[in-house]
Regions:
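Phosphate/pyrophosphate-binding catalytic cores of soluble transferases and nucleic-acid-acting enzymes
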Residues: 1-312
Length: 312
């Protein structure tokens, strides 16, 4: 936790695995401490995907001011650096109003950018980046990943072969700066060093989380508006490498539309993907959020009291 002396510059971070109840708790907290919520989920930034990405409900948006939700087009990339810049501006404006910024989400890289800062990697031209992408497209992701690990062994076990965006970024950084992306990451500092940053992680037991995931998946997929928004998204036919394609459920619903799986299989496959994602989030938190306060209680009222105690 940050120093308690900077009460007028307090920022609260709330993270946890998907479906752990972050959004609901953050709204309760914001109402209690006069706060405003800032999105820290990389899939909830998109305008076109609201229901499938579990963006806050309209009722919650009316209760508390929310920032950085549904503002970005799925047709373009949006980097961690761009997000951080917007967050800093948002946080400053919220504090100026005498309120408390509450960052809520499950994207580990977003929170790492807030707590540790971003590396100052020299700009790499679009021509060079496109040249790297051509190599990737030509040889495929498996061979390209081997090429990355060969040139930059520090990436092994840190970047998944299937994470196209990060694989390409790591490769181009190593090739054109002669330094690993992880060497650059060593020389970073947080833009929020002068703030009182409180870090809360919702540490929900796995068996309870799986029930929550299952319930949420059924509810989302039963909503015809969800299927309609995915249909509209697919009609945009965006470039495959764009991050929005990785929103859980897109591929599965597409397969359902094409008659390649039943509705029952759709629910099960989305559940599997969501459980896998939750596991990755938990693994990330154990490695990168070691100084975060982990809270949990079976009773939501007790959980809220624990969080309130940590941020007061």
């Amino acid at each position: 936790m940050g120093s308690k002396s900077n009460n007028n510059k307090k920022i609260i971070l709330i993270s946890g695995p998907t479906a752990s109840g972050k959004s609901k708790l953050s709204v309760l907290l914001a109402k209690k401490i006069n706060g405003e919520i800032i999105n820290a989920d990389s899939m909830q930034i998109y305008k076109e995907i609201s229901i499938l990405s579990s963006r806050p409900k309209i009722t919650d948006l009316k209760k508390v001011k929310h920032h950085l939700y549904g503002f970005q087009s799925v047709n373009s990339k949006f980097s961690v650096g761009q997000w951080l810049k917007k967050v800093k501006k948002c946080a400053i404006n919220i504090i100026k109003k005498g309120k408390v910024p509450i960052l809520v989400g499950g994207t580990g890289l977003y929170f790492k950018a807030v707590t540790s800062g971003l590396s100052r990697i020299p700009k790499i031209s679009n021509n060079k980046r496109e040249a790297v992408k051509k190599i990737y497209d030509k040889i495929g992701y498996k061979k390209f990943y081997k090429k990355l690990i060969s040139s930059d062994p520090l990436c092994k076990n840190k970047i998944l072969a299937s994470d196209t965006q990060r694989v390409l970024r790591a490769f181009e950084v190593k090739r054109f700066t002669k330094k690993s992306i992880y060497e650059w990451a060593k020389n970073t500092k947080s833009d929020f060093k002068e703030y009182d940053v409180r870090k809360i992680y919702l540490n929900i037991p796995r068996e309870k989380l799986l029930i929550k995931i299952n319930d949420r998946t059924k509810k989302i997929l039963a909503d015809q508006k969800c299927l309609k928004e995915v249909k509209n998204f697919l009609n945009l036919n965006i470039i495959k490498s764009l991050p929005a394609n990785k929103i859980i459920g897109i591929t599965e619903i597409k397969s359902f539309f094409e008659g390649r799986q039943t509705y029952k299989q759709l629910i099960e496959n989305v559940n599997i993907k969501t459980r896998q994602y939750a596991k990755r989030q938990s693994t990330w938190s154990r490695g990168h959020m070691t100084d975060w306060v982990r809270v949990y209680s079976d009773k939501s009222s007790n959980l809220f009291k624990k969080i309130l105690k940590e941020v007061s």
